[in-house]
């Protein structure tokens, strides 16, 4: 027997064909959301307050300090927030201290700071009763970047950009003449030496001494001449910079100093964030530039004075390991004193080392670094500017390397915690201005922290973020996998990201650093391709937001691959050689072969086993969770794998789902981490189980009660239903699944079913990927799902009085009211059809003032019945089903309703959707199709033992699509079902051809795994043997019930009077210009005229046509289309004199052609009001007769 058994959870064992030992399990799959939010609550929120406070008044006499904050218990639980359309949030109270510096008086006060959104255990937020989540964002990391540019003449030059988290950009560039320029915040450029002079290095000699002599530097100095002898070089430079930043304003050296400080050196205006400082120091550190260079000075141990490395030594990896600790401890540090009139006249600490230029071995180049400032330093420093210029000058000498912005070392994830932190910062900075103004304008004696603080900017900022940000999304709740995928998704779009229209091919493309960090498969098809991505299955995000991938460390001394796992970021991984996960190992964890396939900076190379530094932990670390659920993914073309991964997320939860016979081993953890299953919070013993709750007695003696969710409407309109899995008396551990969620079976994800599939054609019904299906799948409810739709009706106060929910509805018979209760609301369990009443509601009509006679009669006989109109809620087209739940919200019950609303009624209608022709089906390999025919079981082809086939697929769908995985799944699935075993075949480490044939043989199937099929209609065998097996097939959310639509009489557009379009508006089908051309080509003049008049926007004509049809008369000639009048009016509004003439050249007045003016019958006699009444009576009679006939049929 090939393979070995592995237990997944408590309820499923699978035979696994994996050969590679997995050293670590998958991490918690939603920790990217939960950890980020936890860090925000623990540290991030307090950090924002500490950044913003204390706040002083303008005079400096008062100060408002932040002391601390406390979150109180939430008003609603998660379930209550859902039911009440509320937010799941907790009130936050912040303690402030107001210090009066003149008197020393302290006032401490706790201030309510609004309700703060809380994350549920599943990583989502409840906002206005609906479940939303914050998608992480992939953005450029702040830092120092260098790039190579080629101009149109083919000349190469280097550029530099300093990107902060917040603040002005600083750029360096070279022109065609070889002069270097600096550009501050995208303004006009000026020579880069001007910036150095402004920092306090006024003379040419000082600059040359600092940076060393290079061609670019000497050429630029020659261009940068002293223009105004009245100013020092430093002052002149400062004024030049001011002139670029504020052209036209009077300039002084002092104002320029203030401006430069505000742009780059002021923490309020400029912020690198810790990640920016980390990236900056890493880029500019000398140790990262020295490898491969020759030293032009000896390296001396500062403590002993011993020469460790001599001059003219080539820096190898070993030499670098020797001098790296010394560089980190300040070797080569020196201090320069800028002139007194510099921007910041303080000593500047730099670090230097001299090397020979790779382009000219005689020339010495001085490399400068910024002295590695502390991570607390979050502004640009003069040392940073000088080091940047030094690095940039060095690039022309072949020292240092340019950056690739698409490298994942230069792009980082902004998760929910950081995004929320930014919103709070925006709110607080708006609040800061208000506080300062109030401090300065108020009387000092009576002022309190509460009086200074207005929390509206903060609450508005958070509310706006959750309500309308591009990154705050309505959660995809089709099934557990779509939930999980949505939580692990990250987007390059959104505020601060890139725009869809300007995204280049490079940004969207797969990059070598995506390996083990970002899935190369799972991304949308269409305009967002490559901009929205998913986290790979083992990936984690570090404190700076960089994605890390795990690797097993190789002990190179002993040649052993250890079980010690290290998480590396993309730029750390570039320094190492990483062996593939499928490299064969001996029993004592050594490489079995002399050489191994490995990766180094994006190259796949064969290296000696002794040179590998790390080894992949698992073959599936490359791809995301959805792709890892596709068996035999390695045998599918990548385009089809992308479709397969994306379509699994569209699977509809079925009423009786089954886990796949052929899985990948990912099904259990995906189901557990998705949030759809019910997990035990503590270990214990199950004391009680029923359909609604499970009680678990903890080992400590306490009782945990778990409520099971039954048939709740999900965000996608599907049924969210949990079923108990735990049994009475069963022992459960923490995080065990005790109830299956939707699309789950026995603790595993179960998106579809395992039908018997044959690859064969049948009467052409599976042409173009169509699917032929057996009637058994309908009779046995194999692919039946439940759709739940929500309808609501509210009563408001109108000018004429309040609306009412009631049974007393004008002109509605008892038959229509039979399912309403005494208050006029439908009863739960009632079966309703299109147009049936759900909530009876009446609205007051406008009444004219009564005449004196009427007033007299009312006084004698009492008040007559009020005039009301029927505004009841009815079942829309295609919405019929069974009333599953009714919820009534009123203020008396303590529900929060919008102003003007007195009562809100919500009705949920459930529909049982059996599969039928037009529904979309798919396998897991991107093989999708539409059900084209449902064949009686007796007509389906059958196996020699009489078993009829369930589904027939077109064999031509396989070769051109190159998704051979489906064929392998088919054969192995048949063997698995025959043997009664579930199988796990992990991606890139699954069943080989030999394993499949061995299992087929074990199951006693034919050697070619094919079979003879017999035609169910004739009993004759088909000519050739046919591939038959078990394949996992899912029903997708694109159901024909949601799409099929036909209009009878419906609404019209106000302006053009043409029917609306679309199913939601009960609209018609557009007869567009191409269709008109077709009729014109056939000369079908009458049909064309009808379509352009009666059936479109001839208002009078359609009324007359209706009347003529009802009376059985000839249909009259059409009138003037409304859109023609609109066109005339539009032309007149442009000042063009448009007149309309009849056939005899008489001018027609369009107003006279209005319905009110002339309304004639076909014989040109005028229509009177009496005639219209008679017409209405005829119509009413015809409708009554029709209803009577229908009722008679029903009785029959």
UniProtKB/Swiss-Prot annotation:
Pfam families given for it? RNA_pol_Rpb2_1, RNA_pol_Rpb2_2, RNA_pol_Rpb2_3, RNA_pol_Rpb2_45, RNA_pol_Rpb2_6, RNA_pol_Rpb2_7
Which PROSITE patterns does this entry report, sorted A to Z? RNA_POL_BETA
Per the record, the GO terms for biological process are:
DNA-templated transcription
Q: How does it assemble?
A: The RNAP catalytic core consists of 2 alpha, 1 beta, 1 beta' and 1 omega subunit. When a sigma factor is associated with the core the holoenzyme is formed, which can initiate transcription.
Single GO molecular-function term?
DNA-directed RNA polymerase activity
Recorded name of the encoding gene: rpoB
Function statement: DNA-dependent RNA polymerase catalyzes the transcription of DNA into RNA using the four ribonucleoside triphosphates as substrates.
Alphabetical UniProt keywords: DNA-directed RNA polymerase, Nucleotidyltransferase, Transcription, Transferase
The EC number(s) this enzyme carries: 2.7.7.6
Q: Which family does it belong to?
A: Belongs to the RNA polymerase beta chain family.
Q: Into which EC class is this enzyme placed? A: transferase
SUPFAM superfamilies reported in the protein's UniProt record: beta and beta-prime subunits of DNA dependent RNA-polymerase
Q: Which reaction does it catalyse?
A: RNA(n) + a ribonucleoside 5'-triphosphate = RNA(n+1) + diphosphate
- Its name, as the record gives it, is DNA-directed RNA polymerase subunit beta
